[in-house]
């Protein structure tokens, strides 16, 4: 009968409308790529793909044991000291800066001449069981060498100071080839080098002469971990040895020093503890 057919048509229309509405809701629920963003506890967001929604999919992926161990293992770079010398770094309270940056010693600002002392403090604190500040080794150098204070320290004075605290060192001129320089850097436990923008200005700008320290040579890419007390943007970065080689200041008596070894028995200082106002 006609009224029964009309009723069937009405039910069919209602069912089809409900199906269409359900499809629309599902389409809004999933994004265009068939993915759903599911918020989990904490700050993680897990992406779930349509058709593959499982209990595992809506949970954050577990962290592997090896990943946990890798995160817990400190990097060799973490144990390297890299002091900053200047007043600007101290004013900004940069990590590795200290009050010495704005202080005058023997009539001169430490920030103007302290790079050599930062280098020696880096070496002593990084390669031995002892620690010191740049100003500690500044005072020590005045006691054990003829360094008068209040200015840049010479190669010979730095070598005498380092020898007094247990290090075997060797002074070098710039080798004629980059390959020779790499070999000397690789053989040392660290290197103390003098760079100048007069020799190459690709990395150091407006730098007549500046001592920096090189640690942790990596033979896979021929880079070193740079301790640059004069520039926070250079400090604690890996730098190509080729960059260092090109910038070696050749108008100096010597161009770099290799830190060959350390003997605790020959360390006449054994400085324990760091006392001072600095950021770390």
Predicted regions and their residues:
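Mid-length scaffold segments of soluble, non-membrane domains
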Residues: 132, 139-175
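Active-site-adjacent substructure of cysteine-protease-like catalytic cores
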Residues: 174-225
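Extracytoplasmic/periplasmic, Sec-exported soluble proteins
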Residues: 107-116, 129, 146, 150-154, ...
